[in-house]
């Protein structure tokens, strides 16, 4: 070992040795902290990937359940538009099926004819189908008005939500879509 010649050198040698130990301790601490940070980053990335995969699986389950519910609702609507009634009498029982290929409301089936016709032709077509053109007073305050608006009414005028004096139409020349209303038994 070296022996210092004066007190100043002795202090510097001693302090350098202590300083070196402190540097090694700080470097060791930095390495440990850096390693801990890296490990925590890897763990958090793995947990994010796991959570993302879990959420994707749950989303797929929810979407398939939603599609199933929509399909069930469509089947229910289709079943509601086709009525199946049993009529019983004192002697026999009848099984009577009727279907409505249109809008069903309070025992009536509203069937849209999208071809544009004169009022007289529309009325004749409905009569041939054992049905009538809709009456404005029957549909005005119901949800049906959104569908039957601007179609022929039974009085020869178009069915509209509003009434005004200038709405008189020329039934001899004007053509419109029309609904035929058939009473379901």
Curated annotation (Swiss-Prot):
Record has Glycoprotein as a keyword: yes
InterPro entries, per the entry: C-type_lectin-like/link_sf, Chordopox_A33R
Statement: the UniProt record of this protein carries the keyword Membrane: yes
Ranges of the Intravirion topological domain: 1-33
Virion surface topological intervals: 57-185
Membrane topology type: Single-pass type II membrane protein
Pfam families to which the protein is assigned, alphabetical: Chordopox_A33R
Sugar-modified residues: 125, 135
Annotated compartments: Virion membrane; Host membrane
Top-level taxonomic group: Viruses
Alphabetical keyword list: Disulfide bond, Glycoprotein, Host membrane, Membrane, Signal-anchor, Transmembrane, Transmembrane helix, Viral envelope protein, Virion
GO CC terms: host cell membrane; membrane; viral envelope; virion membrane
UniProt region (C-type lectin-like domain), positions on chain: 98-185
Transmembrane region(s): 34-56
Quaternary context: Homodimer, disulfide-linked. Interacts with protein OPG190. Interacts (via C-terminus) with protein OPG164. Interacts with OPG162.
Family named by the database record: Belongs to the orthopoxvirus OPG161 family.
Main function: Forms a complex with OPG162 and OPG190 to coordinate the incorporation of OPG164 into wrapped enveloped virion (EV) membranes and, subsequently, the production of actin tails. Therefore plays an essential role in efficient cell-to-cell spread of viral particles.
Protein's name according to its UniProt entry: Protein OPG161
Species per Swiss-Prot/TrEMBL record: Vaccinia virus (strain Western Reserve) (VACV)
Taxonomic placement: Viruses, Varidnaviria, Bamfordvirae, Nucleocytoviricota, Pokkesviricetes
Gene it is expressed from: OPG161
